[in-house]
Amino acid sequence: MTDASLSRIRSLSAAAPSVPLLVDVSRTCLPTHAKTSDPLLLEAFPAAFSGMAALEGGAIANPDEKRRVGHYWLRAPELAPEHLGQAIEETVARVKAFAADVHSGKVAPESGKRFTNVLLVGIGGSSLGPQLVADALGSGEDKLRLFFFDNTDPDGMAREMDRIAAAGGIRHTLTVVVSKSGGTKETRNGMLVAQAAYTALVSAGLGEAFN
């Protein structure tokens, strides 16, 4: 790194250790000597803040699907419209309770043992987000091992099934299917592959039939 680059980072970054948060805008078009009184910022900041307020208030951000952008409401449900905030808090509580039941063995496979694996089936952000969390925060102390069907490549899914087999098999694996729309064809393909693996257990007399 050159002295000029380091100087620019120092001039155009700010740290808030108590959060913790570091904001670095040194790679933007802002001049090194930029100040909050500059016309560029005087125009940009109000527009950015009003746009953020509109999104947080539930404005339609995807007109094609008539969808709002509220994923950050999961982290701060108090920002969501009242009825949505309550629904988010109740849903998060149910998810946490279900996870606790899986960890404790209250929700368990037919073998009577606990689930040791989770297979997540999803495409795009539906799998990329969980993969990021698993890679960033996972450790050897995790109670469940994570596996992913994140595309429709048959060889890729076969390799992941081999990894699951080496980790105790599909009979000890809880499968989670994630789709924003509920109708993603690629996700359905992965779900059918997982379903076929469970059906094979039934054929082998190692499980009960399911729909």
Placement of each model-derived feature along the sequence:
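Glycine-rich phosphate-binding loops that contact phosphosugars or nucleotide phosphates
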Residues: 97-100, 104, 113-211
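Extended, charge-enriched "interface" segments that sit outside catalytic cores
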Residues: 1-111
